[in-house]
């Protein structure tokens, strides 16, 4: 997806799929189609819209008396993470540094984006500022720390979870 824009520059070498997608538009998340559109034409159709989920290692959490079912907000997550760190010296959750999955989740949750409605770069808008602040607050509270290897899909990330270095994963 991140490379798709490269294929829509200049003389587009892709087939316009607008008419083929039209009967299905009501069943597709419209914002996903925007990723594959240029000048009103659709050049690709997404086949996946990922959901965000939280995974908790209940064995680790039970050991320190944290009930993951009570975590409903980022404040709850921060409180549980601080308690977990106090009890174990380990991190509750993580922040990735290579994929920005967590950051992008927060930006979207806050109703923001990297560009404004006119397509202009907007990296200092309030949603982005608030997402960065929330990540900083979580880290300052010892609720999260940086993921070894930069992300959960790296060998170091796999090992960190297998070793019990983190009790929660948001993805």
Tell where the protein language model's regions lie, with residue ranges.
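Aromatic-glycine-rich donor-binding/catalytic loop that engages nucleotide-sugar donors
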Residues: 59-70
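Alpha-to-beta junction loops
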Residues: 1, 12-13, 90, 163-171
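Short helix-initiation/N-cap motifs at beta->coil->alpha
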Residues: 72-78, 147-159
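Hydrophobic residues within well-ordered alpha-helices
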Residues: 77, 84, 107, 158-164, ...
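Glycine-centered hinge/linker elements that transmit conformational signals in sensory
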Residues: 80-82, 120-150
